[in-house]
Amino acid sequence: MKSQWSNFHQIGRNSFLAASTVYVSNEFNFLNTSLLNRRSFCFAEGDRSSFVVLKSEAEFNSALSKARDGSLPSVFYFTAAWCGPCRLISPVILELSNKYPDVTTYKVDIDEGGLSNAIGKLNVSAVPTLQFFKGGVKKAEIVGVDVVRLKSVMEQLYK
């Protein structure tokens, strides 16, 4: 069967569109078990991850205080339920939170009630946005989906 994306070669290989475009077949293969081997978004028992979902401004302020006083290396992941790119990068962030268990990753849903002031405190204007803190200082920021840069920043700052 020929792909319906005949002009796909005109899109840059490293562009977001190329990375997020998925060919959909007219047939479904029930024998395809690749999804069975994928990691669940739920944390398994014994998971070493340090992934925290912030639900209130008080929780956000506490996390930001820990990040700014230097006591806790942190990543703030600003996201939204409606954000397609956020859904693409979420599994990578979960994987990295397991790889670097001493770094706390805080997930902040920008549409969560009471967190609108949090967005202003760190000057977040788009999602996904990741801000990296080490030694009490914001060391890096990534806006958008850049998996290679995300892995590189994590390795440089927290290894």
Curated annotation (Swiss-Prot):
Site (Contributes to redox potential value): G84, P85
Keyword Phosphoprotein in record: yes
First-listed, main subcellular location of the protein, grouped into a coarse class: mitochondrion
Localization annotation: Mitochondrion
Phosphoserine: residues carrying this PTM: S40
Positions of the Thioredoxin domain: 43-159
Active-site residues per Swiss-Prot or TrEMBL entry: C83 (nucleophile), C86 (nucleophile)
InterPro entries tied to this protein: Thioredoxin-like_sf (IPR036249), Thioredoxin_domain (IPR013766)
PROSITE patterns the UniProt entry points to: THIOREDOXIN_2
Cystine pairs: C83-C86
Domain of life of the organism encoding this protein: Eukaryota
A GO molecular-function descriptor: oxidoreductase activity, acting on a sulfur group of donors, disulfide as acceptor
TM stretches of this protein: none
Keywords associated with the record: Disulfide bond, Electron transport, Mitochondrion, Phosphoprotein, Redox-active center, Transit peptide, Transport
Pfam family, one: Thioredoxin
Cellular component annotations (GO), alphabetically ordered: mitochondrion
Family: Belongs to the thioredoxin family. Plant O-type subfamily.
Function (record text): Thiol-disulfide oxidoreductase that may participate in various redox reactions. Possesses insulin disulfide bonds reducing activity. Reduced by thioredoxin reductases NTRA and NTRB.
Protein name: Thioredoxin O2, mitochondrial
Organism expressing this protein natively: Arabidopsis thaliana
